[in-house]
C-alpha cells in the first residue's frame, strides 16, 4: 500500500535537508524541497565558477551552498540527506551522518514510495532505455496519461502532486539507484545481466544484488518480468513475491512472450511479424517481447503492434547516420559495456569497422573478443581502455588463427578519419565503444553527437 504524499510533506517541513550533488537531475528536487518548507543546503564538489548561474539561482530562493573539494566533510547536523545515486551509501561521511541520526535517502526512493500512479520499473545491463521507451509509447498509445523518468526523461519527484491513480509512470532504474532501495515498482523487469559498473560496485555479486531490489519489496499482486534466455535472470523466478512473466527469443513461452516462426507473440497471441519491425537487431526483438509482458494487462494487441511496427529507435542506439561513398555509418554510443556492443554487432549482417574504447569500468573484454572477432573487419581503438581491448582481441586472434587489423588512435576525429580511409564501398562503420565515456566526454550523448557531427562533415 502506497503512502499518501501528505505524509512526506508533513515530515519534510522545517527539516534541515542536505542534497548532495547540484547536477541537472537534482536541481528540480532542491527547488521542490524549498517549496515544501524544508531548510535546504546543497553540496557539490564543483566550485561556484564551474556551477555557473545555478549557484546564484539557488541562493536567491534561500538554499545554502557547500562547495569544493572537501564538501562532504560538512554533512553533520542534518535531519535528512538526499544522496546522488552514484555515491555509495557506505562512504565514511554517510556512515557518520547516519550514526548521528540522519535519514539518508534518494529522490527515486521517495518518489516510488509516494507516487499515486502505477509504476513500471525497468533495469538490466542492456536494453533499459529502449525497453523503457517502448513501454512508455505503448501505454501512451493506449490512451493513458503516462510519465517517463529515472535515467531518462525529466526528474519526476517535483511533479508528484500532478499525478493521479489512473496515471502510469515508467522508470529506467540503474544499479546505483537500486542499491539503497527498500521499495519496488508494482511492475518490474530485469532485461538481462552481465558484468558492468565494477568501478563502483565491489564485485559482480553486489551488482546483481542491487538489481534484485527492483522486485525484492513487491507484494503478491505485483508482476516481475524476466529474461528466460539469461540464466541469471531466469533463475530469479524462485525469489519472486508476485506473478512472473518471461520472454524468450529461442524457446516457446506460454506464460509470457516469445518469437515463434518469426512471429512476436504474447500469451500465445500474435502481435506482429518480425519483418515488419523497424528496430534493428535481435536484441531489440527481445526488448519488444519484454515490453509486451510489462503492458499485457493494460494495453491492447493493436497498441502493441502499432508501436512495434512504427517505433524506429532511440538516439545513440544503433542509429543510422548517413551513407557516404557507399559506406554506412551507425552511432551506437549508448553501448557502454562489452555485452551491449556485442548485441550491436549481431544486428549487422556482415563484419563491420568498429570504433571502440573509453573509460575503464573494470570489466573484462574477453567476452567481446570471443563473441565478436568474426563480426569485425577492422578494429579502431581509443580512450583509456584501448590497450586492454587490444590485448583481449590479440589473444583471441592468436588462438583462433584469424586476422584482424587493429588501429590505435587518440581522438574521435582521428578514429573517423582512419575508418573513412580504410573503408571500401559496401562497408559499415559503427561507433559502439563497449565502455563509458567519462575519460573523454561528460556522457555518451555528447560522445555520440561528436561522432555524428564528424560523420556529417565528411
Swiss-Prot record:
Known EC number: 6.3.2.9
Pathway(s) the chain acts in: Cell wall biogenesis; peptidoglycan biosynthesis
Subcellular location: Cytoplasm
Keywords carried by this UniProt record: ATP-binding, Cell cycle, Cell division, Cell shape, Cell wall biogenesis/degradation, Cytoplasm, Ligase, Nucleotide-binding, Peptidoglycan synthesis
GO cellular component: cytoplasm
Reaction it catalyzes: UDP-N-acetyl-alpha-D-muramoyl-L-alanine + D-glutamate + ATP = UDP-N-acetyl-alpha-D-muramoyl-L-alanyl-D-glutamate + ADP + phosphate + H(+)
Amino acids binding ATP: 124-130
Gene Ontology terms describing biological process: cell division; cell wall organization; peptidoglycan biosynthetic process; regulation of cell shape
Major subcellular location class: cytoplasm
Matches recorded under Gene3D superfamilies: Mur ligase, C-terminal domain, Mur-like, catalytic domain, NAD(P)-binding Rossmann-like Domain
Pfam assignment, any one: Mur_ligase_M
GO MF terms held by the record: ATP binding; UDP-N-acetylmuramoylalanine-D-glutamate ligase activity
Purpose of the protein: Cell wall formation. Catalyzes the addition of glutamate to the nucleotide precursor UDP-N-acetylmuramoyl-L-alanine (UMA).
Family to which this protein belongs: Belongs to the MurCDEF family.
Name of the molecule in the record: UDP-N-acetylmuramoylalanine--D-glutamate ligase
Species in which this protein is naturally found: Clostridium botulinum (strain Okra / Type B1)
